[in-house]
Amino acid sequence: MNRTHLAFSKTGLALATLVMISACATQPPAPTEDRSVAEQVRAPAAEQTRGLQVYPLRNPAVTELSQAALAAEQAGDLDQAALLLERALRIQPRDPELLQHMAEIRLERGEWDQAENFAARSFDVGPRVGQICQRNWRTVALARERLQRYDEAANARERLQECQVEPPVRL
């Protein structure tokens, strides 16, 4: 009886240890392919900062929510990032950066129609030059490619060129 009790105790201890270790496991990051979609939008715009850039003024609460959304996105929690951006958009619904960030989150989630819609809304209320404009049209182009609307994607890539405006020469 002691041997049986000892065997059950060892088995129970092993199972308890296994359960505790498995509770420490983290969720796997989002697939690399999905993450690279938004980077295809952001990276080229960041590299082309020579031209004229336009940035709207922001509410401090919106700035905080936007930064938290970026941190959640970088941690791989796209649902939390989208939730935080939705809250920020309730405060400032016509903020082109927020709308574009939401478009990029939708790209990462594979929600091509929504990504295109958010990018178009961002362009409608945002600047017609600079990084935001470039990110808008890259998002639209990528979303249309994923939706197999290749002619429309090519049109979006042409519009992208209009976003690059050189600042005036200062003497």
Task: Mark where each language-model region is.
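TPR alpha-solenoid repeat register
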Residues: 98, 132, 136, 169-170
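Bacterial Sec signal peptide processing site at the extreme N-terminus
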Residues: 18-45, 171
